[in-house]
From Swiss-Prot:
One of its GO terms (biological process) is mesodermal cell fate specification. It comes from Mus musculus (Mouse). InterPro entries: p53-like_TF_DNA-bd_sf, T-box_DNA-bd, T-box_sf, TF_Brachyury, TF_T-box, TF_T-box_CS. Residues 100-273 bind DNA. T-box transcription factor that plays an essential role in the determination of the fate of axial stem cells: neural vs mesodermal. Acts in part by down-regulating, a specific enhancer (N1) of SOX2, to inhibit neural development. Seems to play also an essential role in left/right axis determination and acts through effects on Notch signaling around the node as well as through an effect on the morphology and motility of the nodal cilia. GO terms for cellular component: chromatin; nucleoplasm; nucleus. This is T-box transcription factor TBX6. Residues 274-284 have a biased composition (Basic and acidic residues). Disruption phenotype: Defects in the differentiation of paraxial mesoderm. Irregular somites formed in the neck region of mutant embryos, whereas more posterior paraxial tissue did not form somites but instead differentiated along a neural pathway, forming neural-tube-like structures that flanked the axial neural tube. These paraxial tubes showed dorsal/ventral patterning that is characteristic of the neural tube and had differentiated motor neurons. Embryos lacking TBX6 show also randomization of the direction of heart looping and independent alterations in the direction of embryo turning. It is found in: Nucleus. Keywords: Developmental protein, DNA-binding, Nucleus, Transcription, Transcription regulation. The keyword Cell membrane does not apply.
Length: 436
């Protein structure tokens, strides 16, 4: 870069508005002075606008100090600090689960953050005193960075590994009871167990957004306000607890923190040694999945005492047929009509639905009163094809109604029913409707 006076030495060492001066520079031709004369730059025209510009070049200097205020106004007072403008005198906050936080802090607290959001454990649980019982207050919580470093797990400890990521948008969690009276807040401890941490910058649920591998600390704010969105606040008090500092991670780095959270978190009981999600149980489930479904050892159809179907547990065992010699058992009917099968699932497709409920799969056999082999040229009468009709009383032309099968009371009075099943303790009113 060059200074203008180095590029145009003919302009002199100073700058001024006006006509070129012949004597200012010996290298400037005097004959050209009149050619570079501009009438608009006459001194008489510029005096009203540029009266402070001197004709000779000068150096810039600091501006003169402003005059002091008159003594009648008195000395100027310094503005009060922000803490004095927004404060709640006499209000104190204590951490209820301080011992638990200290136990984690001694090891190095880690908090899991996920895209969907993960709750904090331990959660912030505080007790407040010194509030006005009649006034209304808001309880807020936010999480702020502790320092400007990024951390990494190196060996058996955390150490800084570089500069922190740019700060994410600040979000505040509002306690769902807000606003409430001071008597309500002081009646019992205030818990922030619903706070969720996320690493998604596009989170639409209002969770607190954090960077992974950064150190944070929760802050709890108590605001005196009558409404949630009030612009007139009566005072603000903020509290921090050193033992609540944590490092956000996507997976636990310290094995001691993992064991401590399993032992202290009541919702992690499945990951304990006697839980369903312990390592031994997880490995066993993986092996079973890789091995495939185990074959079920079953006997041939009709060889057992009870039918092997999906509804075996509903059998009552108190069903008796009126004529066991005439009515075969469900096992005999299944074995006579179905080939040997290898499992209960195949038998379920071969048996009549009534067999699963212990009922005969067909009406009881009766001695027919017609010829066994009717003439093929003539169609069989209706009574011979479907019902066993008996002559009515007095030799009338009307036939008596057929008798009710012996298994019908089982479906009417209670017990297992064909579809639809009744509710617990209920009965299915069959009435005069057909059974199938």
């Amino acid at each position: 870069m060059y200074h203008p006076r180095e590029l145009y030495p003919s302009l002199g060492t100073g700058y001024r508005l006006g006509h070129p001066q012949p004597g200012a520079d010996s290298t400037f031709p005097p004959a050209l002075t009149e050619g570079y004369r501009y009438p608009d730059l006459d001194t008489s025209k510029l005096d009203c606008f540029l009266s402070g510009i001197e004709a000779a070049p000068h150096t810039l200097a600091a501006a003169a100090p402003l005059p002091l205020l008159p003594s009648a106004l008195g000395p100027e007072t310094a503005p009060p600090p922000p803490e004095a403008l927004h404060s709640l005198p006499g209000v104190s906050l204590s951490l209820e689960n301080q011992e638990l936080w200290k136990e984690f802090s001694a090891v190095g607290t880690e908090m899991i953050i996920t895209k969907a959001g993960r709750r904090m454990f331990p959660a912030c649980r505080v007790s407040v005193t010194g509030l006005d019982p009649e006034a209304r207050y808001l309880f807020l919580l936010d999480v702020v960075p502790v320092d400007g470093a990024r951390y990494r797990w190196q060996g058996q400890h955390w150490e800084p590994s570089g500069k922190a990521e740019p700060r994410l948008p600040d979000r505040v969690y509002i306690h769902p009871d807000s606003p409430a009276t001071g008597a309500h807040w002081m009646r019992q401890p205030v818990s922030f167990h619903r706070v969720k941490l996320t690493n998604s910058t596009l989170d639409p649920h209002g969770h607190l957004i954090l960077h992974s591998m950064h150190k944070y600390q929760p802050r709890i704010h108590l605001v005196r306000a009558t409404q949630l969105c009030s612009q007139h606040w009566g005072g603000v008090a903020s509290f921090r607890f050193p033992e609540t500092t944590f490092i956000s991670v996507t997976a636990y780095q310290n094995p001691r923190i993992t064991q401590l959270k399993i032992a202290a978190n009541p919702f992690a009981k499945g990951f304990r040694e006697n839980g369903r999600n312990c390592k031994r149980e997880r490995d066993a489930r993986v092996k079973r999945k890789l091995r495939g479904p185990e074959p079920v050892a079953t006997e041939a159809c009709g060889s057992g005492d009870t039918p092997g179907g999906p509804c075996d547990s509903t059998l009552g065992g108190d069903i008796r047929d009126s004529d066991p010699e005439q009515a075969p058992t469900p096992q005999e009917a299944a074995s006579a009509s179905a080939p040997p099968c290898g499992g209960p699932s195949a038998e379920a497709y071969l048996l009549h639905p009534a067999a699963f409920h212990g009922a005969p799969s067909h009406l009881p056999a009766r001695t027919p009163s017609f010829a066994e082999a009717p003439d093929p040229g003539r169609p069989a009468p209706y009574s011979a094809a479907f019902l066993d009709l008996q002559p009515g009383p007095g030799g009338s032309a009307y036939q008596a109604a057929p008798s009710v099968p012996s298994f019908a009371p089982h479906f009417i009075q209670g017990g297992p029913f064909p579809l639809p099943y009744p509710g617990p303790g209920g009965y299915l009113d069959m009435g005069s409707k057909p059974m199938y």
